[in-house]
């Protein structure tokens, strides 16, 4: 998907974060890998425009996958907010999304993100 502006980047990010979460739940790795690529492309576009702040409202989105991906994208830009969002997910979700949030925090602490 070719992103042309910030609005498209945000839509692409959110839609694909939702898809990625669904694929994580149901094991559809092919579709999940495609959505992952689209999320990363959206993050790269947003980064190139220096507009990470458009992702901050997504830290409170109803969809856990959207929140996790927003936190991932913001870990080096707004570390306190991103870490807080991930910790809340770990605390409140005992399923795969909680595990994903915990792994994201662990990898960040190790310096791998």
Short names for language-model regions:
Residues 18-21:
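Alpha-helical repeat scaffolds in large eukaryotic proteins
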Residues 2-4, 11-15, 26-47, 68-77, ...:
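Structural detector for internal amphipathic alpha-helices that build alpha-solenoid repeat scaffolds
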Residues 64-88:
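Charged low-complexity stretches with an acidic bias
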């Amino acid at each position: 998907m070719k992103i042309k502006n910030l609005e498209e980047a945000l839509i692409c990010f959110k839609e694909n974060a939702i898809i990625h979460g669904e694929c994580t739940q149901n094991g559809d790795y092919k579709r999940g890998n495609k959505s992952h690529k689209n999320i990363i492309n959206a993050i790269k576009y947003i980064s190139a425009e220096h507009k990470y702040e458009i992702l901050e409202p997504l830290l409170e989105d109803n969809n856990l996958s959207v929140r996790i991906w927003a936190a991932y994208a913001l870990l080096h830009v707004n570390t306190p907010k991103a870490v807080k969002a991930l910790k809340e997910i770990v605390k409140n979700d005992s399923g795969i999304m909680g595990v994903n949030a915990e792994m994201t925090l662990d990898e960040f602490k190790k310096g791998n993100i």
